Amino acid sequence: MIKVGIVGGSGYGAIELIRLLQTHPHVTIAHIYSHSKVDEPLKLTFPHLQHIMQHFEALTVDNNDCDVIFFATPAPVSKTCIPPLVEKGIHVIDLSGAFRIKNREIYEAYYKETAAAQDDLNHAIYSISEWQSFDNNGTKLISNPGCFPTATLLALHPLISEKIVDLSSIIIDAKTGVSGAGRSLSQRVHFSEMNENLSAYAIGNHKHKPEIEQYLSIIAGQDVSVIFTPHLVPMTRGILSTIYVKFSSEYTTESLHKLMTSYYANQPFVRIRDIGTFPTTKEVLGSNYCDIGIYVDETTQTAILVSVIDNLVKGASGQAIQNLNILYDFEVTTGLNQSPVYP
């Protein structure tokens, strides 16, 4: 059995890791770390986890017996705590943005904090699971993608890699539930501010914009810029990303649908919807699926892609476990076969 540790045990990402890893046949949760709740029983913070008798612990590097440690922490914590663990030879899967952006200046412009050391950035492997493979011996630090980038890049990847679109025309209109903001309180997630309300936020300066651009640029082999506008909607979970991009050659809904279904034919967690149907966030709730609906406006030769995920599962903890499966050469669906919760 692989011994796993979870850092940031009092946050939503960690809660999902605990929930999902309980059913993983090759994993045992050895330690749950939280610096603010050391020695407290897990069930005191999360009453729905009454059946788990573990207590929160303080993270240590010396004598740490974990094979893999998941970090579901803010980026500054990850930057400080992860390098010593990697140096010790422990595999780390980081759910924060600390190691996603390889250019330190760009990171600091968007995150408003000092970037990780360049050596650490160079060694971190950014992994959207559907297009990644690892060397178990050589890979020590996996940088899990953000939630908006996951939904967006999975939809755009086939079009960019096939070089069939105008790279200057990408517009991303994305909606997210409030759990994406974490458990910390702020005015914009207060019930009276959020309920019966819809708001755009972080226009032009959202942390996920350079992440999307960086990895689209890698796929395209040239610099790519996007227009990205996120919105906060009054629901707990879910991301719906509507993406508009113009073709550089003629396409129809049928021909694009054929391309997308072929591209993801062997990827169990990406479900391309039938022509004329479009996914909703509730249809992936609690699951590791990304569902994508496709339409081509043939008059303007514009693709309209609707991509939905659960931001806490495929957009965070589920994909982290998917990366664990790839790292250890397990069947990619291991521990992640949960159907969406509906209604």
From Swiss-Prot:
Gene3D superfamilies in UniProt: Dihydrodipicolinate Reductase, domain 2 (3.30.360.10), NAD(P)-binding Rossmann-like Domain (3.40.50.720)
Keyword Cytoplasm applies: yes
Mostly located where?
Answer: cytoplasm
Q: Which SMART domains match?
A: Semialdhyde_dh
- InterPro entries named among the record's database cross-references: AGPR_AS, AGPR_type-1, NAD(P)-bd_dom_sf, NAGSA_dehydrogenase, Semialdehyde_DH_NAD-bd
Q: Which UniProt keywords apply?
A: Amino-acid biosynthesis, Arginine biosynthesis, Cytoplasm, NADP, Oxidoreductase
Q: Which GO terms of type biological process are on file?
A: L-arginine biosynthetic process
Q: Which GO terms describe its cellular component?
A: cytoplasm
Functional pathway: Amino-acid biosynthesis; L-arginine biosynthesis; N(2)-acetyl-L-ornithine from L-glutamate: step 3/4
- Care to name a GO molecular-function term for this sequence? NADP+ binding
Q: Where in the cell is it found?
A: Cytoplasm
SUPFAM superfamilies, sorted = Glyceraldehyde-3-phosphate dehydrogenase-like, C-terminal domain, NAD(P)-binding Rossmann-fold domains
Which is a Pfam family this sequence falls into? Semialdhyde_dhC_1
Similarity remark: Belongs to the NAGSA dehydrogenase family. Type 1 subfamily.
Q: Which HAMAP family match?
A: ArgC_type1
State the protein's name. Answer: N-acetyl-gamma-glutamyl-phosphate reductase
Q: Which organism is it from?
A: Staphylococcus aureus (strain Mu3 / ATCC 700698)
Annotated gene: argC
